[in-house]
Regions:
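Blade-level signature of beta-propeller repeat domains, shared across WD40, Kelch, NHL, RCC1
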Residues: 513-550
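Short glycine/acidic-enriched loop and turn motifs that connect beta-strands
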Residues: 225-227, 272-277, 331-334, 391-394, ...
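Repeated scaffold domains used in trafficking and secretory/extracellular systems
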Residues: 253-263, 310-322, 361-381, 422-434, ...
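A short loop-to-beta-strand structural motif that recurs across blades of beta-propeller domains
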Residues: 227-229, 286-291, 333-336, 394-398, ...
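Short loop/turn segments immediately following beta-strands, especially the blade-tip
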Residues: 232-238, 293-295, 337-347, 399-408, ...
Length: 550
């Protein structure tokens, strides 16, 4: 028993000894408030730029006195009290000053030198192919003037160097290639490669917008994960010239399902990242908006934003007249705002944003469409609204303003019109009033053309107009972007009323015999043509005014 007590005492003593061991503390070294400095660019005319090659004056303003050590973040150091330094490469640098054992740091961003290009025509004339000459001006803000730049210009195919007829290639080496003409319509991209002091700078590109000699209408379209593009509907391009799209330099957005053109303004309806069902429990997943873009892409304004609100209220589809811009959400109804309004934030508590029409305010509700029937394109023709649905009662439905109920309808008993293409996935349609034809695209089937006379005859007997094969004029299949009942499909169609042509963007299904691109249904030849190939378009719009450029 005594032995056990001794063992226990030994254990306690060992534990006590181990508890007395001291660990070395960890010391953190922090910048001192007593050490400070400022810096500025001394090159005249470059004071705000902080470019590669700039002379930067560092000034010690510390409260402490003593020997100074500067570390400039690029591996260079100095022990001068107030040194100057030049950075040879762009980047974010951490500058450190140590005085008497204390230190401080400050970040310094050095920007790279990059030339700028300006393209000009005499008297600011519109540049058209094979005629109007373009001159280029290059500016290089280079604080280290001793280093001379070397320029190489890469010009687009079809460029003629008027002042250098001996050059037949698309490359010019020198400060300025002189006067240029272009033989192809569209955005002609010029690339400038610059070497300065033996170092290659970032390539600079300039788009010269080259128009057509034949005044033509302009077709706009939004490219998936790309930009807003424009295309001249000129089918009489001179031999040897090509007609390519214009890049407006404006991002299309996440899902710009509809474009609307009115009074020289292109309205872009982008329903945002989330366009299919989502459990938006916090009602804050919305990120859709309507943007007004100048016809040449030179400016843009926010018309309406739903950012931070309910996702299902994002603007999906639209229609515009001389006074109002109408926009449909995902599956509830259509709202409207003035065409000239800007910088609006959608607020469903504000009576200004009350619905113009809702699913449950028409006699179609519950008979045949259901709660939350998915919206699609809509239009007003000769005083009558046409509204496409893709799910929960697919088809095209019609109503007049007077058919809109002022109270909710639990189940409709007297629909105002028979249905066009009942139970079909109809995302887009357009009506040719001159030739009295309704064109519509049905998913997995293709383009249908229905004489309005047939629809009127069916209306007289209260019979739905079905998607009979006799109306199918072109077969194709879209990709599966989206989900069941909410596929993006062909999301918009436009009509050129002057010749009856119908245009739309097709993102073809993989393996489809009909390629992706901007399509034209030519009623004269009854053929589906590819106008612009190799693009994945969403919304599309037409400027009916003819011009050489935009």
């Amino acid at each position: 028993m005594k032995a056990l007590r001794n063992i226990g005492l030994t254990v306690v003593l060992l534990a006590s000894l181990s508890a007395c061991v001291e660990n070395d503390p960890t010391y953190n070294v922090y910048p001192s408030d007593d050490v400070a400095f400022t810096y500025c660019v001394t090159n005249e005319g470059y004071e705000l730029d902080y470019l590669v090659g700039s002379t930067i004056q560092f000034t010690n303003t510390s409260a402490l006195s003593g020997a100074c050590t500067w570390e400039f973040g690029d591996g260079e150091t100095s022990t001068e009290p107030n040194p100057t330094h030049t950075y040879n490469l762009p980047g974010q640098y951490e500058v450190k000053l140590t005085v008497g054992g204390e230190f401080t740091t400050r970040p310094l961003l050095i920007n790279d030198i990059k030339p700028t290009i300006v393209a000009k025509t005499e008297n600011d004339a519109v540049c058209v192919i094979n005629d109007v000459e373009v001159t280029l001006e290059v500016t290089l803000r280079n604080p280290a003037a001793s280093a001379q730049p070397e320029y190489t210009w890469v010009l687009p195919e079809g460029t003629t160097l008027v002042d250098h007829p001996e050059i037949t290639s698309n490359t010019y080496v020198g400060e300025n290639p002189g006067r240029l003409t272009f033989k192809n319509i569209g955005s002609q991209t010029i690339t400038l490669k610059t070497t300065l002091g033996g170092r290659a700078l970032q390539d600079v590109k300039a788009n010269v917008q080259v128009g057509t000699p034949n005044a033509s209408k302009t077709l706009y379209y939004a490219v998936k994960s790309g930009n807003i593009m424009a295309y001249k509907l000129d089918y009489n391009v001179p031999e040897g010239s090509s007609n390519s799209p214009f890049d407006l330099g404006v991002k299309s957005g996440a899902h710009p399902l509809n474009l609307l053109f009115h009074n020289d303004i292109l309205y872009v309806l982008d329903c945002g990242t989330q366009f299919t069902y989502i459990n938006d429990t916090e009602n804050n997943r919305g990120d859709g908006k309507i943007t007004a873009v100048a016809k040449d892409g030179s400016s843009m304004e926010t018309v309406l934003s739903n950012v931070g609100n309910t996702a299902f209220n994002d603007p999906f589809y639209g229609w515009i007249d001389s006074e109002m811009l109408y926009f449909a959400d995902r599956n509830t109804g259509i709202r409207r705002i003035g065409v000239n309004e800007r910088n609006l934030a959608l607020n469903t508590s504000d009576a200004k944003f009350d619905y113009f029409v809702m699913n449950n305010r028409l006699e179609y509700y519950g008979n045949p469409w259901q709660y939350g029937a998915m919206n699609a394109c809509f239009a007003k023709v000769d005083g009558l609204w046409y509204w496409g649905k893709t799910y929960g009662g697919g088809g095209i439905y019609r109503f007049a303003d007077s058919d809109i109920s002022t109270v909710d309808i639990s189940r409709g008993s007297n629909p105002p019109y028979a249905v066009i293409f009942p139970d079909e996935f109809v995302k887009s349609f357009v009506i040719d009033t001159n030739n009295q034809i309704l064109y519509a695209i049905i998913r997995d089937k293709g383009l249908f053309a229905v004489p309005m006379a047939d629809i009127s005859a069916n209306d007289a007997s209260k019979t739905n107009t079905k998607a009979d094969n006799k109306y199918l004029v072109a077969s194709f299949k879209s990709d599966s972007d989206g989900s069941t009942g909410e596929f993006v499909d062909v999301c918009q169609m436009v009509l050129d009323s002057s010749d009856g042509s119908v245009y739309f963007g097709l993102r073809a299904d993989e393996g489809s015999t009909e390629p992706s691109g901007i399509k034209r249904w030519n009623p004269a030849t009854r053929q589906l043509e590819t106008v612009v190939s190799g693009v994945s378009p969403y919304g599309i719009a037409l400027n009916d005014n003819v011009s050489n450029l935009f």
